[in-house]
């Protein structure tokens, strides 16, 4: 009753995924600014404590670096939005649901998409959505299961990364504050010493707040999706196209947020998340 898992491996859809992967790769190249910010946050305050005569210079450099960091954020936002539109083209054409031109604006043109796809030489994009989404399922149910995968997969990753960032921020600034108190360092000097780490603080707080909001939104939408699946399990009621489009709107909006989890963190639990996704789909199908 649906051919989603078969059609997703057609050349057209693989090309979309290749283009999207390149765009996000271009975006994530600028995560080097995040890494540098973290290293600066660790090294520069220590240098300031060891060499008091360069504290003012370190503080000025910290402010300058923060400005550079914020400028790169604008580039990342644009690339993230481009990647989100390509992924939206993949989903809407695969699911055969309407494009929301009001929300998503224009599609990425074919020339740009083809040029991007040519840059990808990997072969790891088959079976984007779980093969546990059987062809016997009604098409609206198959679509909403795919949409559920988007929420469930990213929700777990975001929870882990927020916890990691909070521990990192509290530990880092806790150590320095304890040191400053122990050494009876004045408030103005503390500000000068911490100034080089401002970009790191912005990165950590910005991501924690943004990802926490996404977690809340994803949990709420996930509950609504499960209610729809429960209705189907009880009386075979399927969602209409309008409901599917509304859920897709939420997915698109959250994909446009530039605070992305680093690749190295994503890869740590990739295989575990894939197995977890398959098991969740299997569990849901037992209710049908």
Model-derived features with residue positions:
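Inner-leaflet juxtamembrane helices
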Residues: 69-101, 204-228
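Membrane-interface, cytosolic juxtamembrane amphipathic helix immediately N-terminal to a transmembrane helix
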Residues: 12-32, 144-167
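Amphipathic, well-ordered alpha-helical segments in soluble domains
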Residues: 147-150, 173, 221-224
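Short N-terminal secondary-structure initiator segments
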Residues: 1-16, 61-70, 133-155
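Membrane-proximal, non-transmembrane interface segments of integral membrane proteins
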Residues: 81-161
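Alpha-helical transmembrane segments and their immediate juxtamembrane boundary regions
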Residues: 27-78, 159-216
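Terminal, compositionally biased low-complexity regions
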Residues: 1-47
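Cytosolic/matrix-facing juxtamembrane and C-terminal tails of multi-pass cellular membrane proteins
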Residues: 2-13, 17, 22, 209-287
